[in-house]
């Protein structure tokens, strides 16, 4: 019987199935950070349970760490407590951790892949919804809650019910100036933030195959914004070349054995999907969100939508509320919207290719950050990304243009550290969520690609980067 990639991964990790379909899955890799792990470790201590498989775990502090000078530590007492608690718990239980001043430290969904801790065919979980990122490797990856974090630490298994299969095919060649971020925003704009609810999405088609691993990670990262719990891309030579030689990757005979298995990690011909969505890459344009949900997105050449043209009353009300919060008027050209701050970073877009794309735009425009932009910041996803960017001189490009070059961390993606928006400030952001208050109380977030964010910083407003040549 022909199987989808999701079917294969699920079946390969099934330990036991109850009569109602509840399945006990084996978990290969567990990633931890400081926000969702303290209560889980406390539960282990109270029950006097050990960590079942210490080597399956990898931890890092990312949400609360400062992205400015770290020599003076963490100023906020709550943030400091969370980071210190993770340090103490990992030391106590013997779990490998990249602490704040380790040059390998970074965002958990960046360091996992770059260390080779994320491998094809794995089940990967983390107490973070954007664990879907790791599905780019043909791994079944999704976020879990704190009680489940404790369960995985104690048993290396997890209970769940199988989702339905969705295939999203993007065929054709992506136009110049468009990126993986534009692909996934266009997908979400098409199916909505509830379109993937109850599904695991496999992303396929020639436009997906043409993406680098970093691009595929961007797409899978935002599967959760489409309502899905997980996103997947089949394994191919691009996957294998990325993984080979990384610290956690198998070597020698074990590598050959792994590749033999990994090469089977694709949907079989004739495999049945519960739903199929198709897009043409040629139709995708640089995307910008205008509202307070990732599905509220248009191309840069469009105007802010008019709620009066929406027939569905529920959607119309949501649009009206979003426009009020964002302080935007219908029919305003997207290119005329000014920005106050620019954030290039997050687990969606903080890898070396993102840094290069943004730096290229800065060099191409050849000017400094616009006078109306209060802050433009670039936050690498890890210490290794930062080091690579500095070897290439990208930091000098940014700093010369007036951008701030920061230390790695989640930063302004969420208002959980010192990097945040003030009420009423408008931000061009390469992150993944534009909910009310996501980047700070009263802050207004527009999701874009790194190139689009860099251009907005220089021009002071959104621009169509296809015009740059």
UniProtKB/Swiss-Prot annotation:
Its cofactor is [4Fe-4S] cluster. It comes from the Bacteria. Keywords: 4Fe-4S, Amino-acid biosynthesis, Branched-chain amino acid biosynthesis, Iron, Iron-sulfur, Leucine biosynthesis, Lyase, Metal-binding. [4Fe-4S] cluster binds at residues 347, 410, 413. Pathway: Amino-acid biosynthesis; L-leucine biosynthesis; L-leucine from 3-methyl-2-oxobutanoate: step 2/4. CDD domains: IPMI (cd01583). Binds 1 [4Fe-4S] cluster per subunit. Coiled coil: none annotated. It catalyses: (2R,3S)-3-isopropylmalate = (2S)-2-isopropylmalate. GO terms for molecular function: 3-isopropylmalate dehydratase activity; 4 iron, 4 sulfur cluster binding; metal ion binding. One of its GO terms (biological process) is L-leucine biosynthetic process. PANTHER family: 3-ISOPROPYLMALATE DEHYDRATASE (PTHR43822:SF9), HOMOACONITASE, MITOCHONDRIAL-RELATED (PTHR43822). Belongs to the aconitase/IPM isomerase family. LeuC type 1 subfamily. Heterodimer of LeuC and LeuD. Catalyzes the isomerization between 2-isopropylmalate and 3-isopropylmalate, via the formation of 2-isopropylmaleate. This is 3-isopropylmalate dehydratase large subunit. The lineage of its organism: Bacteria, Pseudomonadati, Pseudomonadota, Betaproteobacteria, Burkholderiales. The gene is leuC.
